[in-house]
Amino acid sequence: SNYDAILHVAGIAHVSTDPKMQNLYYKVNRDLTIKIAKKAKKDGVKQFIFMSSIIVYGESQKNRAIITEETIPTPSNFYGKSKLEAEKGIEALKSDSFKSVIVRPPMIYGKGSKGNYPKLAKVAKKLPIFPDVDNQRSMLYIDNLCEFLHLMIKNEESGLFFPQNKEFVKTSEMVQFIAKTHKKRIRLVRFLNPIINVMIGRSAIVNKMFGNLVYDKNLSKYKQNYQIRD
């Protein structure tokens, strides 16, 4: 093959969670991914890198459970399940001549990012107040992800990886920072916290904003520094 490595990031995400979409999610995120990996192996590609997601561990939690090496994936929706099944299909193809890298990043942010980050940015630019809830999230800046992937290829790695930024993020502090960069002022308040705490676990939107979802920092360490931006 003329290719040393394939980085597979294509897939369906941030689309409707309507049950009617389930078959399409599995077809694209699982079946086509495994099909591409099989072709890569057949054609002599040495390394296949698959972009999975922290979502394989389920949604955010009210309590501060930390994902460790022993944490068993328990996806709560067909997006997470399709990613996890794709992982298993790729792992089954691994051999001495065909290395597989599974990357489970947390929420990725940066210019042009999709998903929850743009929603938070929109909130930061429009609302005068925001709930100051004490939560923690693992996040990954796009430049740090790119450097991590570069090292995966350069070092001809194989295995399961969990890259993240050096520090966890508190949603309210992130929203306040975004507002500041856009020269907006937003005040953090706690009078809404009792309502938020009741809603965590009951509302997917509230879970994503104010729930806890973090990797053990030791899980994300690598022999070379990839966390080049704070």
Language-model region placement:
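NAD(P)H-binding glycine-rich loop region in Rossmannoid oxidoreductase-like domains
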Residues: S1-D31, K35, K39, V56-E59
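A conserved pocket-lining segment of Rossmann-fold NAD(P)-dependent short-chain dehydrogenase/reductase
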Residues: D18, K122-L140, N144, F148-L151, ...
